UniProtKB/Swiss-Prot annotation:
Name of the protein: Mini-chromosome maintenance complex-binding protein
Keyword flag Cell cycle: yes
Keyword Transport recorded: no
Main function: Associated component of the MCM complex that acts as a regulator of DNA replication. Binds to the MCM complex during late S phase and may act by promoting the disassembly of the MCM complex from chromatin. Required for sister chromatid cohesion.
Comp. bias (Polar residues): 193-207
Cell location: Nucleus
InterPro entries: MCM_complex-bd
Subunit details: Interacts with the MCM complex.
Source species: Arabidopsis thaliana
Amino acid sequence: MGGPAYDCLTNPLGAVRFSFVNALSSGYDPASSVGKDWGVVDLFRHYFSDESAISQVPILDSSSIKWVQPKTLVRFRGMIQDMLGNEFYAGAYKDDSTWRTNKYSDVSQFPEGSSTEIQVWERRLLYCVPVPGKNQWTECSSQELKNRFLDLTGQNREKRVRVDEEMTDSMDSSTLEAGRNGSPFKKMKVGEATSSASESQVPQTSGIPPATSADSLPCLVKIYDSPESDLKLNDVVEFLGVLTFDPIVMMDTDTLDENSDALSEAESVQMPSGKVPRLHCLIHRKLETQHFLHGSSLLPEPKSPQIFKEIRESLMKYLTGLLGNDHIAAQFLLLHLLSKVHGRVDNVAVGKLSLNLIHLNKESMSIFGTQLSGALKSLLPFTQSIPLTIEYLNTASFGPKKDYGINRLMPGVLQIADGTHLILDETELQPGTLNSVGVENANLLKNLLECQKVEYDFQYYKMEMATDVQMLIFSEGKSNIMPADLVLPLQPSQVNSLEVITPETAETWRCYLATCKSLSHSIGQELQQVVENDLVAARQTDRSLGSQDLSRLLTMARMMSVSYGETTLSLEHWQMVLELERLRKERLK
C-alpha cells in the first residue's frame, strides 16, 4: 500500500501513481501493456477487504455531492441503465525518460512536443442511475460519515500537497514553470481539471447539480480492467472509485475548440460533469438485498429454526392486521414476498409467484391497499407501483427504446432491477379503448408476469431481457389484463389502525425476508414420492389442473419451507400448502 501519504480513501490518485512507479521499477512496460492493471485493483481490494472499511467511503448521491471532494474516493450504488460503449484515452505518456499515467482520470495530460510517447488505452462507459423504486430506509445516514470524511481530508491535505510536490520535482522545471503561467498540457476534455491530486488544484464543489432529489443523481461510470461479460444491463452494482465533478463546467458540443482532442467521446461531451458526475471505477461488486440492510447482515444459518419461527409469527401477525385480520391472505402474501426466479426451463420462470388480491374496490383499496403498499415500502428495498388505468396505459412508455439520434437507451417504466416488488392497481380501471401504445404496454405487462421478461426495442430489432420482479395485483374481479399465478378474494373482517413498528423490528423483518430468499431448498427422496402421489391424485380429482398449477404448488412448498428457515421440505409444510390451496379454491367458488 502507498502508506499514509497515499491514503486510498482521501488520495486515491496518489495511490494509483505510487503503485504505477512501483510497477515500473518491477518491469511493467506501459508501451506493451495496453493499459493492463499493474496492481491497483489488488491494492484497493486489500484496503477495502471488509465491510467496516467500505463503510468509511461516502456514498455518492444528491446530498453528499454537496460536500464530497473531487478526486477522492466515493461509492455509487445504482443500476446500469445504459451501456455507452468504449472510450479511448491517453493512458500513459513519457515525460523525457519517465513514464507517467492518466489512468482513472478524466483529463489526459502530456507535455507538448512531437517526440512525446503516448499510449492510447480503452475504457468502458456505463450510465448508471439510483435503483428505481429504492426506498428511503436503504439510505445510510450521511452526517456522521460526512464529519468523519471531512476530518480525514483535512488531516491529509497538507500531506498530499507535500508529497505531490516531491513527485513533481522530478519533472522538468521549465515544464512546471510553463504550467504555472500558461499550461503546457493538452486537455482531452475541455474545461475539466487536471489529474493532479495537489490540493491547490482541486476545485471546490460549491455548487449543486441541477437535479437534487435523492433518486435523481445519475453517474457516468468509467470501467477499467473488467471483462465485458462481468457487468450487464440492469445489474445493481456498487462502484468504488475516483469522483470527478465540476458544477461550474457546462460543456456543450458547440463550444468545443481546437484544443479539444479527437479522443474525447461524444457520450462524455453530451454529459457535462457539472450535471453528471464521473466515477472512475477501481473495484466493484454486484449487490444483493442484504447489502442494503444496515450492517449488511443476514440471519444466522438456520441451525435454530425457532428463531425463524418466532420472527415469522411476528411478521404474520403484522401482515394479518394490515389485511383486516385475513390470516389466509397474509399466508399467501408472505409466500409471495419470498418468491424469486431460481431457474428457467424454456420460457418458464421457475420460482415466480404473482398474487392477485380481488374483491377490492376504490373504497377498500384506499384502506387496505394503501396500508399494505406503505408497509411493503418499509420492508423491501425496491418497490414500484403502476396505476392500471386506460389513460396511463395509452400514454406511458413501459418498454425501453433505443434512440439512435442521441445513441441512448431511453428507459421505460419496466426497466427495473431484479428483486423489485411491483404493485399493479387495477381498481381505478374504467371501461375504455386501448390505443396501439396501450395494447403494447398491456402485452409487455402480461409477458413480464407470465415469463419474467421485458422486451427492449432497439428499432431494427427487439430483444427480451430476463428479469425477476415480484408482482402483486389489486383488482375488484379477477384481472383480465394480468393473469396471476394466484388469485385470492380478500376477506377482511375489520379495519385495524395502522400498527407502528419500531426500527429494530422493521430491520429484523427485513433481515428475515432477505435471509429466507437466499436459502437453498431441496425435496428429499422419500418425500418426493409423497409429493408425486399427491399431485397425481390432485390431477385425477380436477382434470383442469395443468403443469403450471403443479409447478405452482411446488413453488409454494419451497416458499413455505424457507419461511421457517428450513432448506428441506417436510411433510408438515407440504400438507400446509395443500390446505392453503384448498382454502383458496373454496373462496373462489
